[in-house]
Amino acid sequence: MLFSAQQLTMFGVPANPEIAFHIFHDESGTYVPGAGDRWLLHGVLFVPEAKRGEVFAALQDVRQKTGYNEEVHHQKLRQSVTGLKARCATGWLRFYFGQFSDFCFYHCLAVDTHSPDFQHDRFGERHHAYNRFARMAIEGAIAWSLKPYARVALKFHSDVKSRKEGDNFAEYIPSEVCLSIDEKRKKKPAAYPEIRLLHPEVILVESDPSVVMSDLREECECVQLVDLMTGSIGQALTGRSGQRAKIALAEIVGGWIEDTRQPPWLQSEDLHRRFSVSCFPNEQGHFYNPALATTSKDQLSLFDALEED
C-alpha cells in the first residue's frame, strides 16, 4: 500500500511523520449459533513502536514487585484478591490507567448475539463471525483513536489459537482492514489516517511466557494485557463469574466504562479516545450502552473482597 508523497516543512522535516503502532488483539466469549456465550468481545491495544520497550519494562516491573512470573490470564483468576496472580493483574490494570493510556489506546467491541437484530445467517462458519468482529474492532479503534494521525504503519499480533482448516484469520485481518480503511478514506479522507502494513499477516503470539520464543517476549506481555482487559470488560458486562478476583478487576474497568459514557467535558478519568467499549446491536441494530453487572448490588465490591480475603 503506497502513501502519497510526504509534505516537508521549511526545515526539510516531514510535516506529517509516519507513526508505527503494534496492534495486539484477543477475544473473550465463544460463538456457537443457537448456543455459546451471549457476548462476544474483541479487544485491541495500540502500542506505539517507540513506546513498546517502556511498556514491557513497566509490566516486568510489576511482575518483579509482586513475585508473579507465570501467565496473566483472566480465565485463571480465582477467589483471592491478594494472591500473587491477582496482585500482578491489578497492577497491570493500574499501570495502564495511570501511565499507558497516555499513549496506548484500547478499544473493545462487544457483540450481543442474543439481540433480535443479530444476523446469525450471515456467518456460515464460526470463524467467519470471529474474523468479522475482530476486523470491526480494529477498524473502530482506528477511526476513534488514530484519527489525529495523518499516517500510520501497523503490525498486527494476536494470541495463538487452534484454528479450523480454511480459517484465513492471519491473512484476512491486515489486508481487509487496509482495504476497508482505504475505501472509507475516499469518502471521508480526514476521518482516517493513511495506513501502511509493516507485516502482511497477523503474527500469532504464545501468551504463556514460559514457552514463548525469546524474540516475542514483549509481544507476549502485551497479548496478556489485552486478554486481561478484555476478560475484565466481559465480567463487567455479564457478572457471570462469582470469583472475587474477577469481580474486583471488573469493578476497575467498569468505572472506566461508565466514565467514558459521559460527554467528554464531564469525564473525570481522562480516557476520552484512549479507552472505549462499543456494544451492539440493540433491537434497532445500533450501538448502545447496556447496564453493567458491576452496578448490581449482588456483585461483591472490591473493598468487601479485600476485607474477607
What kind of feature is each model-predicted range?
Residues 1-309:
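Phosphate-ester processing/binding pockets and catalytic centers
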